[in-house]
Amino acid sequence: MNNNFDRSKHIYHNEAFVELVKDAIRFFHGTPVHTLPPPKQFKGAGVYAIYYIGNNPLYKQYADWNRLSYNAPIYVGKAVPKGWRQARNSDNALNQSTELFHRLKEHSRSIAAVSDLDPSDFMCRFVIFEGAGSDMIGTIEAALIKLHKPLWNSCVDGFGNHDPGKGRYEQAKSDWDVLHSGRVWADRLNGIPNSYES
């Protein structure tokens, strides 16, 4: 056992990994843009970005940025394969499910539930990771968030939240749910939300 600590012996760096991440991000930015949700259900898990193109004055800058090309996502997220967190996922095509499509559909329902946003004002793009590539999902999501700093990831937290479930409604509404009220489960939350004045 060595009691001398040298931080440099714990730092991992691999230029090939850095290039792999850059390549995946380049591929992501070249994927087609679709309505939210996409027009057809598909199998797979992966990373996605949501773009705003509507007239809500809160997000006018995003609509302007995305007018000619989709370069400014308002939100970036991921959908992982079933069993991913417990390392029980299968790469077998017969066992693939539709996590990515359903996550995008869930976001569309969240937007439709509020009165001041319209799902038709949102577009999305995504990349599907299969096999060993699914290990990249979290890394690429984090890299895209770091690169774009989407508003609903960085400043207005809570868009991607799920219903916390029975017995867990003592928490406060997220910033997103305070700005855009209407999600039924969020209206059940009893905690005191953050003050916008502080």
Segments from the language model and where they lie:
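Boundary/linker segments flanking structured domains
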Residues: 1-74, 78-198
